[in-house]
């Protein structure tokens, strides 16, 4: 299970995060610096936990923290600080930094609140994908469709992600509330992404939206079943199915789809060069 979690994090740090930043048009960092931070993060999670492993993961944490602080400063300096989009961008930056922080905790081998090592690692995965990748997709959809539904998705995501984490760390009663909130929000985002796939004729977005709907229904069903003592799916199998659907089906396909759409749109906007 650890190997799967590390593999999904590799996808996040090398592909999902830079692709999400590019799709949103937000400042990241130079490609060489990003590759160095991502590589050392991978090495830090692959060696024996300890101080050296922690040191190897710190470049990625600092890169994510820099991005998160940058979005926060932009929000505070913005004349439209109370608009949903800059708030969402800041939240995505914060969630990414939190995910990197949990990766550092996993590398150190620390077990806060007595968590199992795999739970610490999966929390890092949660914030990279449910935190950053989900947010990037929600923000991108809202840029095309500013309406109540995209607003509900943005707010539900910003509330649901910390609620799930809070439920895991404090109260088993909060966890299903957070899971259902995030699952409902995810299902709505999935439908909006499918709708956008029809508009743009994008198979990538169609796969992304359908994968998210499936993953969110699975997550909500699992959380509710656990709460009421009905164990129809073990944790390892749920994490594998849910994680793969979210990582590859939703996040990767969705961000590739938006990247391709943006590239096509930019070509259409290029002025024609007419020879005299």
What annotation goes with each model-predicted range?
Residues 1-274:
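Hydrophobic alpha-helical transmembrane segments of multi-pass integral membrane proteins
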């Amino acid at each position: 299970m650890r190997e799967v979690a590390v593999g999904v994090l590799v996808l996040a740090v090398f592909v999902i995060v830079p692709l999400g930043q590019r799709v949103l048009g937000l400042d990241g960092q130079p490609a060489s610096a990003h590759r160095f931070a991502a590589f050392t993060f991978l090495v830090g999670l692959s060696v024996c936990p300890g101080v050296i492993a922690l040191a190897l993961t710190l470049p990625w944490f600092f890169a994510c923290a820099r991005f998160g602080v940058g979005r926060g400063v932009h929000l505070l300096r913005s004349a439209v600080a109370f608009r949903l989009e800059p708030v969402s961008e800041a939240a995505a930056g914060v969630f990414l930094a939190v995910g990197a922080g949990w990766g550092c905790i996993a590398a150190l081998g620390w077990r806060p609140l007595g968590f199992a090592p795999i739970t610490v690692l999966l929390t890092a995965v949660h914030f990279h994908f449910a935190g950053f990748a989900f947010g990037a997709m929600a923000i991108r959809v809202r840029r095309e469709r500013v309406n109540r539904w995209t607003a509900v998705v943005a707010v539900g995501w910003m509330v649901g992600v910390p609620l799930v984490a809070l439920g895991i760390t404090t109260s088993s009663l909060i966890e299903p509330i957070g899971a259902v909130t995030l699952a409902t929000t995810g299902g709505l985002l999935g439908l909006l992404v499918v709708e956008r796939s029809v508009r743009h004729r994008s198979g990538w977005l169609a796969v992304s939206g359908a994968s998210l709907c499936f993953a969110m229904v699975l997550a909500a069903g699992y959380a509710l079943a656990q709460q009421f003592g009905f164990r129809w799916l073990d944790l390892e199998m749920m994490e594998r199915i849910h994680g793969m659907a979210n990582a590859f089906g939703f996040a990767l396909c969705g961000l590739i789809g938006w990247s391709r759409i943006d590239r096509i749109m930019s070509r259409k906007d290029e002025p024609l060069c007419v020879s005299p």
